[in-house]
């Protein structure tokens, strides 16, 4: 008598692991000659743009750029802005095979000091957070034949990353300030946001379409023809489409793509009526493939004593696309020192998914205002909000989310209250895990037979009892019990008398 066993490989995921590193940020901003002197610093912020995680030789590298923005008041009472861009990078030791890796970068405490009228020193840190899932290859039983072997066969759908692809390109466009606007002077603040609106997978190619949104808050040049002082807010939307080479990718695969927009480079045209905009964009595409895994979760022999070894395995079984646009309406009460509003905007932070699957939105609500004498002021407050997501109620093992502002507008009421309406986009993927037991080894003792079976057994099964347990107890197949008793479900829906013949 022979026992024929067939095994298959399956990549199991370990417990999600998180690694952290503090990266110092130290820089000095020396004001260019055409910038006015510093009298008072109003606002300073560090913003980051991260690159995709790079895996190489047992290390996972988190990198990107951090931009330190400083808004200040000049000796003439003007609202001015300057910034310093610097790269960052940190490599984490991650031995073993990594199933998935994603990073986030959080801004820590930043200190700012005007050393003199022309120099601003900044000292602080950012925190790089790496989230990984280790992959472990296991051999599990897929089928067994001979020697009276009876298998409880199950099937699970698994999702694995078929490939990650990166393509960098640069968008260079001209933005018109519009009719009646005075000549451009200088930038107070600017921002960029990239959104992929369409993503298609074809054989060995990924096709993306979307748009890049640029916002610029600016003031006119001092001797402009228009007497308006500003500031003015100009918004530009540039459509983009790019194709990414992706060898080995199938049309049936699922793709999650995003445009990572760096900090824009903006300069005025000679006549000050247009802006020359240059921005670096990174397309990051992650492709997922679904597979069906058949395995044996339990077995026994109708003829011989058998020994079965089972292990608990965890797999990524679902990749849930997350694309949620949340309309946020907030009121900003003006402090007594403020009389008029210059600008109100929202700066979203890294979104999270809580244990219950809900999305957690954190943001800073920011406002430039003026006091009764026309001097610039700055205020901000934090926003925290939970919203529904497609991943609610799921066992989330891992997620990759990004955020940006789709649309935004503000108004200033007579009662001394600023109101802001923002459409916040949360985009990315949440990965769900499934844990189950599978047979990893089995053997039979051909010297020990199970003995003769009774001709017939009447068994009274309780509600909720599993037919497999009954079949294993009496060493008959589950299929024969279902056929003999005209049953269609493995779990008894009520107390039932079962004939085992």
Residue ranges and their predicted role:
Residues 2-446, 450-453:
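Membrane-lipid interaction segments
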Residues 362-366, 484, 501:
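Generic beta-strand/beta-sheet core signal
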Residues 445-483, 488-500:
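Primarily a LysM-type cell-wall glycan-binding module
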């Amino acid at each position: 008598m022979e026992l024929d066993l067939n095994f298959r490989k399956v990549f199991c995921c370990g417990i999600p692991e998180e690694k952290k590193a503090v990266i110092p940020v130290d820089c000095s901003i020396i004001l260019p000659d055409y910038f006015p002197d510093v009298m008072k610093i109003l606002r300073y912020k560090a913003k980051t743009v991260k690159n995709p995680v790079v895996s190489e030789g047992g290390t996972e590298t988190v990198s990107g750029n951090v931009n330190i923005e400083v808004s200040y008041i000049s000796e003439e009472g003007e609202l001015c802005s300057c910034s310093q861009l610097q790269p960052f990078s940190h490599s984490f030791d991650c031995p073993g095979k990594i199933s998935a890796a994603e990073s986030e970068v959080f801004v820590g405490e930043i200190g700012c000091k005007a050393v003199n009228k022309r120099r601003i020193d900044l000292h602080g840190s950012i925190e790089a957070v790496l989230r990984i899932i280790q992959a472990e290859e296991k051999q599990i039983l897929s089928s067994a034949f001979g020697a009276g072997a009876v298998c409880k066969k199950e099937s699970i759908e698994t999702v694995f990353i078929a490939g990650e692809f990166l393509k960098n390109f640069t968008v260079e466009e001209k933005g018109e300030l519009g009719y009646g606007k005075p000549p451009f002077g200088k930038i107070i603040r600017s921002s960029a946001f990239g959104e992929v609106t369409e993503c298609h997978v074809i054989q060995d190619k990924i096709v993306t379409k979307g748009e890049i949104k640029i916002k610029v808050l600016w003031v006119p040049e001092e001797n402009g023809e228009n007497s308006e002082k500003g500031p003015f807010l100009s918004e530009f939307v540039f459509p983009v489409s790019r194709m990414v080479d992706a060898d080995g990718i199938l049309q049936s695969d699922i793709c999650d793509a995003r445009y990572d927009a760096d900090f824009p480079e903006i300069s005025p045209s000679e006549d000050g009526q247009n802006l020359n905009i240059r921005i670096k964009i990174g397309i990051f595409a992650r492709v997922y493939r679904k597979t069906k895994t058949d395995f044996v979760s339990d077995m026994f022999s109708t003829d011989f004593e058998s020994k079965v070894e089972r292990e608990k395995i965890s797999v990524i079984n679902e990749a849930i696309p997350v694309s949620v646009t949340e309309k946020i309406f907030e009121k900003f009460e003006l402090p007594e020192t403020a009389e008029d509003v210059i600008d109100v905007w929202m700066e979203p932070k890294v979104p999270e998914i809580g244990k219950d699957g809900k999305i957690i939105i954190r943001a800073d609500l920011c406002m430039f205002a003026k006091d009764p004498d026309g001097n610039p002021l700055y205020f901000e407050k934090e926003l925290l909000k939970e919203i529904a997501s497609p991943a609610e109620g799921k066992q989330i093992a891992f997620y990759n989310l990004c955020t940006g502002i789709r649309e935004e507008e503000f108004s200033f009421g007579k009662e001394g209250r600023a109101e802001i309406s923002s459409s916040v986009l949360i985009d990315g993927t949440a990965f769900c895990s499934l844990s189950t037991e599978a047979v990893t080894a089995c053997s039979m003792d051909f010297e020990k037979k199970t003995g003769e079976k009774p001709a017939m057994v009447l068994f009274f099964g309780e509600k909720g009892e599993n037919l497999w347990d009954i079949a294993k107890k009496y060493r008959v197949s589950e299929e024969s019990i279902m056929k003999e008793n005209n049953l269609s479900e493995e779990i008894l829906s009520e107390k039932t008398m079962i004939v085992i013949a």
